Amino acid sequence: MSHLDNGFRSLTLQRFPATDDVNPLQAWEAADEYLLQQLDDTEIRGPVLILNDAFGALSCALAEHKPYSIGDSYISELATRENLRLNGIDESSVKFLDSTADYPQQPGVVLIKVPKTLALLEQQLRALRKVVTSDTRIIAGAKARDIHTSTLELFEKVLGPTTTTLAWKKARLINCTFNEPPLADAPQTVSWKLEGTDWTIHNHANVFSRTGLDIGARFFMQHLPENLEGEIVDLGCGNGVIGLTLLDKNPQAKVVFVDESPMAVASSRLNVETNMPEALDRCEFMINNALSGVEPFRFNAVLCNPPFHQQHALTDNVAWEMFHHARRCLKINGELYIVANRHLDYFHKLKKIFGNCTTIATNNKFVVLKAVKLGRRR
């Protein structure tokens, strides 16, 4: 846990998933402080919109103003709810919207934590363009190293005149005034042909490797299991290309597409609808934090290309949670398959959790591993 003192309220905040690391990562950053310093209770008029509030620092601080928390991360929503509870703040104080929803009209203040991907930022700025006015105060923040010329140009292109502040504690702010500059329409998704298939893959703004198949998934697809039955999970499904391939290779199986990103799950659904509509009755789509709340001993196999970062921070906390959830939800003799960068040494992590691990394939960058849930059902 970490403490954030600001002009609105003193907060105790924790990351989600929680970690027991000796030196845990902090649940807020200097950009959060810097953003809050720009505001005064007396000048906040109209709806307050907060975009990409990773662990709820801004939402908790401004809870008295009933803000809207907007983003593409279910984990961030869970983190914000947990930190509201931790600080004795009514959860209903914050309204949660995903980035594809309609934003509230005529907001008085918009606070944006600059996301990792320009594509998501552009989608969000275009959504804001429909609702902000020239009187809306628009401020974005991030680590100084994460604000580039391209970031500022995007604000200028979509919303209007943009300036940036001096750095403070290695954070920087962007101030923007809306003047409705001319702007061409843009498609909601980016599409590309998947090599070796007849499929066209569609990707919403925040999907990993949006403009083509990432090399880890390409390697994984060469080693996916075939002719399985029962239920298979594509955990952290992204655009669903792994799940699509599983549907094709395992015609007797049902595939459950799971991701914490609403845009990823929407992309997966769209890709099944457009490429294998006949398989829709063998699919389930789930926005979730890994497999939280899913009954144990349910699945025959789980396949996963786990992330090794959370927002801008490098961490294996999310992957570790995915592995534990997979073990809990697998049937006896059910199998977990993962692909990962070799340097992450997931072999020993899986062996610690499952008691076994087998290397299926390896190249100079990636490894495909399999772990089996052994033992009797208790």
Curated annotation (Swiss-Prot):
It catalyses: guanosine(1835) in 23S rRNA + S-adenosyl-L-methionine = N(2)-methylguanosine(1835) in 23S rRNA + S-adenosyl-L-homocysteine + H(+). The keyword Glycoprotein does not apply. Keywords: Cytoplasm, Methyltransferase, rRNA processing, S-adenosyl-L-methionine, Transferase. It is found in: Cytoplasm. GO terms for cellular component: cytoplasm. Its main location: cytoplasm. One of its GO terms (molecular function) is 23S rRNA (guanine(1835)-N(2))-methyltransferase activity. The keyword Amino-acid biosynthesis does not apply. Gene3D superfamilies: Vaccinia Virus protein VP39. It is an enzyme of class 2 (transferase). SUPFAM superfamilies: S-adenosyl-L-methionine-dependent methyltransferases. It comes from the Bacteria. Its EC number is 2.1.1.174. Specifically methylates the guanine in position 1835 (m2G1835) of 23S rRNA. Belongs to the methyltransferase superfamily. RlmG family. HAMAP family: 23SrRNA_methyltr_G. NCBIfam families: PRK15001.1. This is Ribosomal RNA large subunit methyltransferase G. The lineage of its organism: Bacteria, Pseudomonadati, Pseudomonadota, Gammaproteobacteria, Enterobacterales.
